[in-house]
Amino acid sequence: MKKLLSVLFILFGMATLVACTPDEEDPTDVVDPVNNGTIIDFGDTFTQKSKIRVWIDDENGEYMEAVIAEFNKVYPNIVVEHQHMGSVDARELLKTFGPSGNGADVFQFPHDHLAQAVLEDLVYPLPVATQTLLATRTNALALQIATLSYDETNKSFDPASPNAVERLYAVPMSIESVGLFYNTDLVSTPATTFEELFAAADIWNAQIATDGSNLTYAQKGWFYLGTSSHWADSYFMQPIFSAFGFTPFGPNLDDPTAVGFESAETIAALTWIRDQLKPRTTGTGNHNSVSAGANFEAGKIPYIIGGPWNHEAYQAAEGLNYAVAQMPSINGNATQTFAGAIMAAVYKYSDNKEDAIKFVEFLNSDIAMELQYEYKGKLPALKSELLENIEGVSENQLLLDMATQLETSVPMPTIPQVTYYWGPGETMLIDVWNNGVAPATAAATAEASYRTRIGLAS
């Protein structure tokens, strides 16, 4: 019986081995019938994507859509949500929506909002690596405007403050300045000095209009030179002040105690404005009595002081052919305009600063600057030699002329106290232009008004 059981176990074991031996016809690898043998890499599928929100002034969204598409070619795992926000509104709204998490990681604003935004604890200082990158590419004036010396402990922008540190706070996107626009059908060679311009103005203003009114061009309000703003706008008048040696807030434009209204240079400029400029631009009229913008668009006057924001209207004006020249000198002294910039910054309390920094750095790239020019027509805030890389800019003579003007411009003051400069400055010019106030008196009043506003009145 034992022998029989042993035989049965041996036979069962042999049968099992035969059953487990693979058939020679069977494949050695099992192929998934669904993917047909394709090896799938799930790395990208399961990579965690991050998200940032950007507030950029782009109402129809086409510009930002194009920028984000290019950004995602470099950073595919950063989702960028764009919300249109006016550049002059972003700072105030971020103060409201930022703390709740409904603000922006990146926001855009003009140059004169920077210091206030820093004081309001809204701006994250950009790292040294970003500053180094931008130093190789960015227009020097624009970079200067975006850089501040700030003592966070004492909330002071005085470079001499004990804990002051100079940092880059924003990425300049575009840069701008006023210039001398002229009708090329009325002027073949633009004036390079105000003396030359005024000599021609005296002849022009005295001419009789050909419309049958029997009035002179001046009586019609068609003065030889106009302004697209008004003659009490200190931003537009800075070139004139500069020719007499006046720049607000000291030589570095950063000393709030040295606004400079009550200086000999300011008084000399006001005297020239009263005696030389006013008679040839408004006659006996007030600072805002002439509609020079409409006159220039209609082809009725040769010159107007304007900025890049005027191009859209002037280019759309039927029959108007114009160009832009450098601001003329006065008494042999060069005139220096203010350079302004639009910039983008990282919100100080963003939950994703690293990706926000990548985005603002990308805004400085050639492709982002090219898209800004294509969609917005603005002069990229790049070094002049890099403008050649931006398609279309080298053929746009109007922008190139502004770039030339910017070579002698001074950066717009960015200290918070600049907010209190414009009001007294405008009143000072109005008093001299409209009200017959002596320049020295108007300057002293402006100085006192400014000092009262910033709490420095004695």
At which residue positions do the language-model features occur?
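Short, solvent-exposed loop/beta-turn-alpha elements that line the ligand-binding surface or hinge
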Residues: 45, 128-140, 189, 215-227, ...
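Extracytoplasmic "Venus flytrap"/periplasmic binding protein-like
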Residues: 70-152, 184-192, 293-295, 302-303, ...
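Extracytoplasmic/periplasmic substrate-recognition and gating elements
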Residues: 79, 165-167, 275-278, 315-378, ...
